[in-house]
């Protein structure tokens, strides 16, 4: 019998412009509480929270508590560590708390219940449990036979240890799988047990006629702390028709050529939306080479009876890329983007770049990191795709 934990999952309204949050838990409401300053006597403070929820050690907090009611408040921060306004109003913890008796991270990836959630390359996201500084994620091809404890399942097909609260699977997953996660301390000793297994299925379906084939811009995520399972950051989430997302974060156009047969062939698609080359061009690969890759991807699609539709490449902001990722951008990027986009515009295409081509760098309010559109840019891209696809579907 596994010991029951006394934890609580606290959830607050998400701020789509936040890079991280700071959470304070207060013992009653102090008389001199200032919404612009940290509370001196806070029972709990965590300023490194990257999604709008936290798993709280309720038993410990109750032992320290002297008043009748615990309150919490949060404030959001930007990339430079500046608060995005003051703390929220202090609210009773109980009003936003879900009791958790399992000492395990809480899975956040909601696969399959929303548009844009069908990912060939899954992302496993979770809220960490108290005391854990790293996590092991396990993927199995059957429901794990050992739901409790910390031992690996005999059905394990993939596992990885990370200090982050999201993990990008580097393998395509076609079929039905389960994933779970457990916490560990910095020595690698278990903190609690496995989370309950989460089932997900990605398989060809006659209902899904459109595939999205690209890199991280299409895979989803942005604003540094949002991943492809934060669907507000995926343009596929705002489309008026179902899609399967065959994109892989980090891909160059050459990688997209290489994995085409393995990753696109199983899905019986009518249309393939192709957006690739951004990572190649910013690293200094020539426009000619990227155009050859895009041409080859189109030919491979046609050979499978799929109609290729190219998406133009929105501009970059090299200063923001440098700040967010510490990566340089090729000096001639504007010229090479213009060359590749001219090729794309000579083919069957959707001009998603046009609304952003002002001759300036991509504005920070549309893309904090200079390459991945934030939620607002993803919405504009989706509107352009919806208008173009309306007549075809």
What function would you assign to each model-found segment?
Residues 225-226, 254-293, 314-319:
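Oxyanion-hole/transition-state-stabilizing segment in secreted/luminal serine hydrolases
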Residues 275-279, 300-334:
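Active-site segments of SGNH/GDSL-like serine hydrolases
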């Amino acid at each position: 019998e596994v010991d029951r934990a006394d934890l609580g999952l606290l959830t607050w309204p998400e701020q789509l412009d936040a890079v991280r949050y700071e959470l304070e838990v207060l013992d009653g409401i102090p008389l001199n509480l200032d919404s612009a300053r940290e509370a001196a006597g806070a029972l709990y403070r965590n300023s490194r929270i990257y999604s709008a929820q936290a798993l709280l050690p309720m038993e410990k907090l109750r032992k320290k508590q002297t008043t009748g009611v615990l309150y919490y408040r949060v404030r959001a921060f930007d990339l430079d560590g500046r608060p995005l306004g003051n703390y929220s109003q202090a609210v009773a913890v109980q009003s936003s708390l879900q009791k958790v008796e399992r000492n395990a991270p809480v899975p956040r990836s909601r696969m399959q219940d929303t548009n844009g959630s069908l990912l060939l390359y899954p992302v496993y996201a979770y809220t960490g449990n108290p005391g854990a500084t790293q996590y092991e994620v396990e993927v199995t091809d059957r429901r794990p036979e050992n739901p409790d404890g910390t031992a690996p399942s005999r059905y394990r097909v993939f596992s990885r240890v990370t200090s982050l609260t999201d993990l990008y699977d580097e393998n395509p997953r076609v079929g039905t799988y389960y994933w779970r996660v457990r916490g560990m301390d910095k020595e690698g000793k278990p903190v609690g047990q496995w989370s309950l297994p989460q089932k997900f299925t990605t398989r060809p379906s006659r209902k899904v006629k459109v595939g999205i084939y690209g890199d991280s811009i299409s895979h989803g995520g942005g604003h540094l702390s949002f991943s492809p399972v934060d669907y507000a950051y995926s343009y596929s989430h705002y489309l008026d028709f179902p899609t399967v997302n065959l994109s892989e974060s980090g891909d160059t156009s050459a990688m997209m050529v290489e994995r085409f047969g393995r990753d696109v062939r199983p899905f019986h698609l009518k249309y393939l939306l192709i957006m690739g080359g951004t990572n190649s061009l910013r690293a200094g690969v020539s426009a000619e080479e990227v155009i050859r890759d895009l041409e080859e991807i189109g030919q491979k699609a046609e050979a499978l009876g799929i109609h290729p539709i190219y998406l133009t490449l929105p501009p970059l902001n090299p200063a923001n890329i440098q700040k967010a990722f510490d990566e340089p951008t090729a000096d001639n990027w504007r010229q090479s983007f213009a060359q590749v986009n001219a090729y794309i515009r000579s083919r069957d295409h959707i001009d998603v770049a046009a609304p952003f081509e002002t001759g300036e760098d991509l504005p920070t309010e549309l893309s904090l990191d200079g390459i991945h559109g934030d939620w607002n840019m993803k919405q504009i891209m989706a509107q352009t795709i919806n208008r173009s696809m309306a007549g075809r579907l």
